[in-house]
Every structure is written in structure tokens, then in C-alpha cells.
From Swiss-Prot:
Disulfide bond positions: C33-C56, C42-C77
Source organism of the structure: Arabidopsis thaliana
Family: Belongs to the DEFL family.
Pfam families reported for this sequence: Defensin
GO biological process, one term: killing of cells of another organism
Name used for this protein in its record: Putative defensin-like protein 64
Biological classification of the source: Eukaryota, Viridiplantae, Streptophyta, Embryophyta, Tracheophyta
């Protein structure tokens, strides 16, 4: 019985982490590209992938979905794990 409770707690911790990461998929680009290069809209992503042509549009923020978790998502993930751990210890 004790082993089953541990497995269930670990499962819900991982599940809460995945849910938090999947809901925080908006990436904000401070220097977007003037044109869209496939899935890359950030200037950094364009230069990183050797798409160096084109200029930048200033004072424009581009939002788009990406399968990469942002720092905030990772931070919320660790917070949810800590909360679930503290709650399970009571």
C-alpha cells in the first residue's frame, strides 16, 4: 500500500509539471525578423540557424507558440513540485 501511494504521488508530480510546461508555450521575441523563416520568428533564432538576411523591426514584440518551455514554465514546474511535496508530507 505504501509503495502504491509513492508511485501515485510521483505520477501526479510529473503530470502537474507537464501541464504547467504545456500551458506556457508562448515565446516573446524582443527583436523579431522582418520576414518569417519557417518556424523561426525571433531574430536570434534566425541568426542561430544561419538565416542572416533581412533587417529587424524595432519596438515590436512577436508572440508565437513553440514546443520549448520558457524559464517561467520551468520555474512554475519546480514550484508545483515543491507544493505537491510539501502537501504530501503533512
Amino acid at each position: 500500500m505504501w509503495g502504491r501511494q509513492i508511485v501515485l504521488k510521483i505520477f501526479f508530480l510529473v503530470l502537474s509539471c507537464v501541464i504547467v510546461i504545456e500551458t506556457e508555450r508562448i515565446d516573446i521575441c524582443f527583436i523579431p525578423c522582418t520576414r518569417r523563416y519557417g518556424d523561426y520568428e525571433c531574430w536570434f533564432d534566425c541568426t542561430y540557424n544561419r538565416y542572416k538576411e533581412g533587417g529587424c523591426v524595432e519596438d515590436v514584440v512577436v508572440k508565437h507558440n513553440r514546443n520549448r518551455p520558457t524559464f517561467r514554465a520551468v520555474e512554475l514546474c519546480f514550484f508545483s513540485i515543491k507544493f505537491m511535496y510539501d502537501f504530501s508530507m503533512k
